């Protein structure tokens, strides 16, 4: 189905241009992920670049952090900045609340604020991680460890992060899919070969012949688990609750009734990405403090455990963040107040529900139930592989396997739907003012 849609899409000039533009941007992203930042000893990075709290950053950047490349920070600062801006719109800063109600003009102001916050966070996080790596390693990671070197490396990494953010915006405007999600998708896909190699090395190289059958059983189990996760995730991500609506006034050609689709998981995979980004920066600071203060500082160890996927406390904290962000982002994606207002303006209503405040309360209750299902789903899919890796000592690929598949499937579904939308537009191009060009 996907390949058939892709084949049809390539026949449309505008769609073909968007696909090729997206591929070009992703090529530049992957190129930058292999260019190491000047002033860093890459060969000394192995000791610290595989720390558990950096797994998420390595995942979304396609191992760019492991190489300490130009794009090592990836979109993590932008994601954190987006969370901050969305929180500030919730009656915290009046100016941000005002902008959120100004339509397109307000959206531009909020985007600009997000960029400024991204710049500050990227600089702070870049210098912090560089200094932290230097403190945690027994070898010199920074060739000349002085404040000028830290500032230079921080500036380069910050520039790289801003460039990646700009790439995401360009994909939004001229390419396919949500820019940030597509870049994360590319990072995960690029990590697959190295992940497969690590499983092969661990399970098939330098093992006794008697252990080979168990290795094959592990691989079969891993593949079957991935298939199950793909099937369940695809089903849940596309499932929706259809809320019937009716029209108070009939106009020529208008339907007498319709429905309002609410997704079973309104937040998508954004909560998982948010939770991973939130845990990365504090964990870096704690690692740095613990190495500089000594390993016997109890409160530092406790906090570090709370942010590490390798402990049960850390897993529960990660799951809690996913649940909280699922509820938060569900109400960001589907605003009950605005939805009730729009229905009333359109002269439509939900049967047996009073328009206005009654509709708002009804949608809020329904959204809360759907978000609960979505939170449980995202939490389980993300946590079960991590727990399995911790209990049975499975390869690292397993720990974030659920998260990776969630993101890959969601981005793929969005891309297919967008392609189908363009093809549908082409089908009815004869009824539109600006039909899409072919050939």
From Swiss-Prot:
The keyword Lipid metabolism does not apply. The keyword Amino-acid biosynthesis does not apply. Keywords: Cell membrane, Membrane, Protein transport, Translocation, Transmembrane, Transmembrane helix, Transport. It is a multi-pass membrane protein. Disulfide bonds: none annotated. This is Protein translocase subunit SecY. The central subunit of the protein translocation channel SecYEG. Consists of two halves formed by TMs 1-5 and 6-10. These two domains form a lateral gate at the front which open onto the bilayer between TMs 2 and 7, and are clamped together by SecE at the back. The channel is closed by both a pore ring composed of hydrophobic SecY resides and a short helix (helix 2A) on the extracellular side of the membrane which forms a plug. The plug probably moves laterally to allow the channel to open. The ring and the pore may move independently. It comes from the Bacteria.
